[in-house]
């Protein structure tokens, strides 16, 4: 790091804090991305295996990982971990299966559907994370959570959740399931989440299409406290148009009673 300019050293430090990676990895990734911090962090999170130089995969004990998989695999189907195995996996991690942390792990494993991991998803996911034990996976959790602070990565995680949560073969996501997952992933991120849930339960009562799911994230990040910046002529789904119409009088009423 001594040969670097002071501005580059600052970027290395910031990169290390943000990605929880080593100095060697930070220098390697930044130098390959023209020392643009935002581009480098985004590329790192999308393809960590391209930049991690600590030979994480080389130090992985494949036999140990296979034994770990065998602890969880379905007795009736050795190519997947079923619901009982997932429960054991969560118990070993001391995590609630319904927690956002378990959803983040599923995202990192690129899991296709809830309540199970295929053998390939588990083995590849653990390998990519450089983990051959529960202890190593536990140690990776803060890094995974940190990753979601980057908006592009959170968007990827959010969009993954729709496909993960829905029943295979169904186009839309059942309303109750959608609300449960919105409460998990948008809690603290969408100021009108409770009002949105109330609106859906009172006025919608149908499944949620993918475009509505995806665009709600954009809506949640741009909408003003009084919804005055909402463009009715914009390319928003009808459901979001209807929600704004439902919510505006309630927001105005709340403000007048608190003044």
From Swiss-Prot:
Q: Name one Pfam family in it.
A: UBA_4
Positions of the UBA-like domain: 8-45
Domain (DCUN1): give its ranges: 60-248
Keywords in alphabetical order, please.
Answer: Nucleus, Ubl conjugation pathway
Domain of life of the native organism: Eukaryota
Recorded GO molecular functions are: cullin family protein binding; ubiquitin conjugating enzyme binding; ubiquitin-like protein binding
> Which Gene3D superfamilies did the record assign?
Cullin, PONY binding domain (1.10.238.200), DNA helicase RuvA subunit, C-terminal domain (1.10.8.10), EF-hand (1.10.238.10)
Q: Which SUPFAM superfamilies match?
A: UBA-like
GO annotation terms (biological process): positive regulation of protein neddylation; protein neddylation
GO CC aspect terms = nucleus; ubiquitin ligase complex
Q: Which residues cross the membrane?
A: none
Which compartments is it annotated to reside in? Nucleus
What the protein does comes down to: Part of an E3 ubiquitin ligase complex for neddylation. Promotes neddylation of cullin components of E3 cullin-RING ubiquitin ligase complexes. Acts by binding to cullin-RBX1 complexes in the cytoplasm and promoting their nuclear translocation, enhancing recruitment of E2-NEDD8 (UBE2M-NEDD8) thioester to the complex, and optimizing the orientation of proteins in the complex to allow efficient transfer of NEDD8 from the E2 to the cullin substrates.
Please state what the protein is called.
DCN1-like protein 1
Q: Which gene encodes it?
A: DCUN1D1
